[in-house]
Regions:
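Repetitive, compositionally biased segments used for assembly/scaffolding
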Residues: 24-229
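Bacterial Sec-dependent N-terminal signal peptides
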Residues: 1-23
């Protein structure tokens, strides 16, 4: 009986952890991450910036579906939401504390490396960031969120993609360099198994730099991506 309870508890913890993993990435064709969306209970999405600040949250009306007729629109969440009070640490007083029973913590004002005020945990998932001593192109950016890791191109890389995401989880990301056609240099070239091509500077003016292929929404290695062209 005891072993059964332990097993059930472990299964529940895994299910809860997976429920707050990275669900969606909104990224432009130039490789700029606009927001990272984490799934909570009741189809709630929590949007966090690449440097660990909460942007907004709400109910995902397109949960489980690939296409979105109104991309990025969240419906108001009617459940219980709590906030930190004025008596809490100055780095997170007034910030959201829990959404639908999922608790959110932040790094306190005493945290080093510029972490103060950034999201520290969402449910059981811990967030980590690149420290101030690391490369200037990505210091302060998110390093890991739960089981998902993030790497970034450094200031030593080609300037067309310096500071842009290099990998998200198991998906590697490449870009067109400064040596490529001016109409698409710096734009996404590949993400995971998906490749991107664009009209060049020799094409009709209205087409230059526009994508030749690639859907606006795609599931890649378990994460939904919204590409903004």
């Amino acid at each position: 009986m005891k072993k059964t309870l332990i097993l059930l508890t472990a299964i529940c913890m895994v299910a809860i952890s997976r429920g707050q993993n990275l669900a969606k990435v909104t990224i432009t064709d130039m490789g700029n991450i606009e927001k990272l969306s984490f799934g909570l209970r009741e189809n709630v999405l929590l949007n966090i910036s690449k440097d660990g600040n909460i942007m907004d949250w709400g109910v995902d009306r397109y949960a489980g579906r690939l296409q979105e007729s109104k991309p990025g629109v969240l419906d108001p969440y009617q459940g219980r939401v709590e906030y930190y009070t004025e008596s809490d640490n100055e780095a997170f007083r007034g910030k959201v504390k829990s959404i639908g029973g999922i608790f959110i913590t932040y790094y306190p004002s005493s945290a080093e490396d510029g972490f103060a005020g950034k999201v520290k945990t969402v449910g059981p998932n811990k967030f980590d960031y690149y420290k101030t001593v690391e490369n200037e192109a990505f210091r302060g950016n998110i390093k890991s969120a739960g089981q998902t890791t993030f790497t970034w191109y450094s200031s030593y890389d080609n300037e067309a993609y310096s500071g842009k995401p290099k990998s998200i989880g198991s998906s590697n990301i490449t870009y067109y360099s400064n040596f490529d056609d001016q109409a698409f240099r710096g734009k996404l070239k590949s993400l995971g198994g998906q490749t991107f091509t664009y009209y060049s500077s020799t094409d009709l003016k209205d087409y230059r730099g526009r994508p030749k292929n690639g859907m606006q929404f795609q599931f890649i290695n378990g994460i939904k991506y919204q590409f903004k062209y």
